[in-house]
Amino acid sequence: MSYRHTQRGTLVLVTMGICALVMIVILIFTSIVIGTTALVVCLLLMIMFGSLTVAVDNRAIEIEFGIGWIHREIPLENVDSAEVIKTRWFYGWGIRLTPKGWMWNTSGFDAVQLNYQNGKHFIIGSDDATALAETINQAKMG
């Protein structure tokens, strides 16, 4: 059994795209150093957080932002169950510490909450939350 899904971070891409355009204008009319630095930061943020890919196989859940510089592997043996949840708007996007535990999310409010055997939780934002939770729970059963 395997699952792989990539969600585009529309809000991140649009916001950073607008930021990049503004930085290009600043670059044209002001200091090259300030404009170039800000433009590079915007482009790096787009590359790093513009998407979230989740893959599940029979041993682990792999999560990576963008091109994979930021990634995490969660062994299935540590997960008790997975359930579909809605995140609160103030949890935001990106990598966040929420009242329910750490959350990785690039867009939207649909998510899967991993319930660890030690009682802690980890939240994965997904526009395919139902299929992701079902896949994780099926992989846990063997």
Stretch-by-stretch model annotation:
Residues 128-142:
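Cytosol-/stroma-facing membrane-proximal "stalk/adaptor" domains immediately downstream
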Residues 44-60, 64-65:
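Transmembrane-cytosolic junction motif
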Residues 1-29, 103, 109-111, 121, ...:
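N-terminal membrane-targeting/pre-transmembrane regions
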Residues 30-39:
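Short, aromatic-rich membrane-interface segments at the entry and exit
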Residues 50, 64-128:
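Non-transmembrane, membrane-adjacent beta-strand/coil modules in membrane-associated proteins
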Residues 18-19, 38-41:
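Hydrophobic alpha-helical membrane segments, chiefly transmembrane helices and signal peptide h-regions
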